[in-house]
């Protein structure tokens, strides 16, 4: 949600109206977050404090809930040693996955809680045969615009290095999170949804995961991605928007907007098309050559 709905303690302009449009039109929606620390109830309170009301815990799906769903679906009798905070502990408890500090079958890693003592115990449990599961692959998570802290991915990588065992990473971009989200949306709509739109600000997680799950992938430029870097990726978003505010009228009217509808736009909203070995930008009929960006492999 950070970078799509809010930045730090401020709503992105137009985000409140966007959410209001979803609610007033009865459009099924779900907020996905890789942050395993908060509970859905925490997120309801946070967004209400920022100025968005009318939300309920059912509107949020965290990587902690995703990990709990995965374990209860694939290994319902498992136990877990948890490195994480309230959101992860609550999600596992709701799914009747016991917290075991003696002989766990899983070490589950989320955000926070990675003390020297806990890391030492986790190392021992993994060496004894426990499987390592991370709620998400993020190496860091934001605390403020100037401060970050280690994420679940960093803690899992530490344990991978110390034990020589590989972790399984859930959360975005893992398809399991997107398929579970689609299922939840279909349940809310009381029918199987043929088309689902994922709106996100990160190419590596939001856009990649949505594409691999067969969803429409809308990239917003209100967060971490700069337009200049979009062409570096093999996969491309379905649409690029300045922010979620560009979607509000479409949701209200049910009619697609002509604005920002091509595969790629530059940072000013001008159409960018691919011509052979170079990119060109169309600005009022004037074509300015752009160097071809390097493609990732």
Labelled PLM ranges:
Residues 1:
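Residue immediately C-terminal to the conserved phosphorylatable aspartate in receiver
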Residues 4-27, 36-61, 68-272, 279-281:
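Asp-based, Mg2+/Mn2+-dependent phosphohydrolase catalytic module
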Residues 167, 288-291:
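A generic structured-segment signal
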Residues 293-296:
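Short, intrinsically disordered C-terminal tails of secreted or membrane-associated proteins
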């Amino acid at each position: 949600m950070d970078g799509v709905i809010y930045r730090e303690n401020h709503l992105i302009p137009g985000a409140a109206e966007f959410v209001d449009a979803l609610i007033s039109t009865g459009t099924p929606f779900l907020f996905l977050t890789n942050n395993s620390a908060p509970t859905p109830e925490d997120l309801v309170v946070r967004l209400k404090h920022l100025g968005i009301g009318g939300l309920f815990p059912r509107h949020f799906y965290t990587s902690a809930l995703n990990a709990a769903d995965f374990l209860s679906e694939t290994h319902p009798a498992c136990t877990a040693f948890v490195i994480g905070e309230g959101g992860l502990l609550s999600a596992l408890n709701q799914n009747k996955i016991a917290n075991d500090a003696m002989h766990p079958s899983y070490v589950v890693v989320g955000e926070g809680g990675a003390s020297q003592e806990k890391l030492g115990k986790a190392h021992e449990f993994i060496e004894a045969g426990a499987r390592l599961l991370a709620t998400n692959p993020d190496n860091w998570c934001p605390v403020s615009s100037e401060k970050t802290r280690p994420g679940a991915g960093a803690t899992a990588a530490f344990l991978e290095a110390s034990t020589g065992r590989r972790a399984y990473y859930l959360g975005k971009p893992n398809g399991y999170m997107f398929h579970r989200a689609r299922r939840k949306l279909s349940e809310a709509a009381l029918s199987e949804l043929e088309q689902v739109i994922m709106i996100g600000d990160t190419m590596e997680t939001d856009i990649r995961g949505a594409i691999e799950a067969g969803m429409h992938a809308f990239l917003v430029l209100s967060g971490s991605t700069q337009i200049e870097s979009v062409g570096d990726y093999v996969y491309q978003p379905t649409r690029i928007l300045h922010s979620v505010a560009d979607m509000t009228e479409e949701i209200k009217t049910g009619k697609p907007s002509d604005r920002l509808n091509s595969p790629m736009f530059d940072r000013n909203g001008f159409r960018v098309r691919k011509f052979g070995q170079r990119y060109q930008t169309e600005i009022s009929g004037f074509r300015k050559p752009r160097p071809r960006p390097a493609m990732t492999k």
